[in-house]
A protein has these predicted regions:
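Transmembrane beta-barrel strands of outer-membrane/channel proteins
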Residues: 1, 42-48, 121-127, 198-204, ...
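Outer-membrane beta-barrel and related beta-rich outer-membrane complex signature
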Residues: 3-11, 46-66, 125-145, 208-216, ...
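Membrane-embedded beta-strand positions in outer-membrane beta-barrel channels/transporters
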Residues: 25-27, 105-107, 181-187, 197, ...
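Residue-level signature of outer-membrane beta-barrel architecture
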Residues: 32, 112-114, 188-190, 202, ...
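Repeated loop/turn-to-beta-strand initiation elements of outer-membrane beta-barrel proteins
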Residues: 37-40, 117-119, 194-196, 254-256, ...
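Solvent-exposed loop/turn elements at secondary-structure boundaries
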Residues: 211-241, 245-433
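Outer/extracellular conduits and scaffolds centered on Gram-negative outer-membrane beta-barrels
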Residues: 236-240, 431-455
Length: 455
């Protein structure tokens, strides 16, 4: 319907927005030395990251007023009544639009020297919460065909509101997990020239399902014997990460060193990927979109339009005469729109996002070998050569469960031998599931020369 800001239309200042990025971080670090051989480090960290949109507007519906079919003064604008003329109110996509991350971590390490051994053992506990809120039309939306309709209490063409189920004023897709780890490492100076380091780390990952609700309509879908439960995060899992490395000073004077190692290493994943599951489950908030022709009608259960005459006479207001989202929500509920939701009342969305119940955080097997050589010249000069090989153990991948297994499908000839998917190769609603894969590897080789011929 044209731009809200052009030579033929205008937007009031309260319909603008900006972004806020707020970071709060706290750290407590306690180092203790009990004896010459025994020490301890206790570390507590807390971080809160809030990325949100804000506006100078107070709570007020967003209102679009169209041109009513009137040509512009110079006669160049279309006169079909679909062009924007005026826009005002709380910006459509800003109310409760935010991503919040809260992380706190407790770590305690004990270091003990025993002869040729330096032993480090510790415990780690981490809690992380991430939520993603997006409430389009959160303060209400009205669209009028003309300025006269708006000023004289005419019937709006469109009314919209997104509201949380169960009276939740700040609905959000939320994920929470707890991660506990225990680890030990030994640095063993076997000889003056050779040091061996080896260790083991165990990590347990535990998700909190309290923020989720099962959608039975989704659960009932059959993807070749597999089902998706929107009310459950991945199962608790234990990750084992052994590691070993060495440094060999061949002549004992650091002129020639061999170093290398191999081990399993676990990484992280942006939790916003996880929040797609509750966001697309349809169990957090309801998006009401009303018009007289194509809107879903709660009275008939059909997409045939809604009687818009209840909205004649101006914006829906509360008992104090203010056009609030709560007042509009109550109006919609009185017209038959849902107030609450249960697992039995869920419906199948246009597309499903999910996380596999056996999903684990990314993990790789990393192996490296390097040579460092000090060239015997009159100034400092060294050469380092290193090779690194990474093998995927658990990587993140997205799979559409509605697409059947391509095994047995015909393939293109030549270099492009992708499978040819025949008609009927998909089943049901698209379901994009975050899974693990062990496929993939990578390697790198580097050579470096450092020289300081003069100071």
């Amino acid at each position: 319907s044209g731009s809200r800001m052009s030579q033929y239309s205008m937007s009031f200042a309260n319909s603008m927005y900006a972004n806020d990025n707020l970071v709060n971080s706290w750290t407590v670090d306690l180092n203790s030395r009990f004896t010459d051989n025994l020490s301890n480090q206790f570390l507590f960290t807390y971080s809160k990251l809030d990325d949100s949109r804000y506006t100078n507007s107070s709570e007020f519906p967003f209102i679009d007023i169209l041109d009513g079919g009137q040509k512009s003064v110079d006669g160049t604008a279309d006169a079909d009544g679909t062009n924007n003329y005026m826009a005002l109110g709380y910006e459509l996509f800003t109310w409760n639009n935010a991503v919040h991350n809260t992380v706190w971590n407790i770590k305690d390490d004990v270091t003990y020297y025993l002869g040729k051994h330096k032993i480090i053992a510790g415990l780690n506990y981490e809690h992380q919460m991430a939520d993603n809120a997006y409430q389009r039309n959160g303060t209400g939306y009205y669209r009028y065909k003309s300025l006269d309709d708006f000023l004289n209490g005419g019937i709006p063409e469109v009314v919209c509101l997104t509201y949380g189920y169960g009276g939740n004023n700040n609905p959000a897709a939320r994920v929470q997990y707890n991660k506990a780890g225990i680890y030990a490492q030994d640095e063993w100076q076997m000889t003056p020239q050779f040091k061996l380091t080896y260790g083991l780390r165990l990590d347990g990952l535990f998700f909190d399902n309290s923020d989720l609700m099962t959608n039975n309509a989704i659960l009932g879908l059959d993807y070749n014997g597999r089902h998706i439960d929107s009310g459950k995060w991945p199962n608790s899992s234990l990750t084992v990460s052994p590691r070993i490395g060495f440094v060999y000073d061949v002549f004992g004077d650091k002129t020639l060193k061999f170093r290398g190692g191999t081990g399993f290493f676990q990484g992280r994943l942006p939790l916003v990927f996880f929040t797609n599951l509750p966001t697309n489950s349809g169990m957090i908030q309801y998006q009401a979109q009303l018009n007289a022709t194509k809107a879903w009608n709660p009275q008939t259960g059909k997409k045939e339009g809604v009687d818009m005459t209840p909205f004649a006479g101006g914006l829906v207001v509360d008992k104090d005469g203010k056009p609030t989202a709560a007042a509009l929500r109550d109006k919609l509920i009185s017209m038959g729109y849902p107030e609450n939701i249960t697992p039995e009342e869920g419906s199948v969305p246009s597309a499903i996002s999910a996380v596999d119940r056996n999903f684990k955080l990314p993990q790789v097997w990393k192996t490296s070998f390097a040579v460092d050589y000090q060239i015997p010249v009159s100034f400092p000069m060294s050469v380092s050569v290193e090779g690194i090989f990474n093998k995927t153990l658990n990587a993140a991948t997205l799979t559409d469960w509605s697409v059947q297994d391509a095994k047995g499908f015909p393939r293109f000839n030549g270099a492009d031998n992708r499978p040819v998917y025949p008609k009927g190769s998909t089943v049901g609603t698209s379901a994009y599931v975050l899974e693990n894969t062990s496929r993939g590897y990578g390697w790198s080789f580097s050579a470096q020369v450092n020289a300081q011929p003069w100071e």
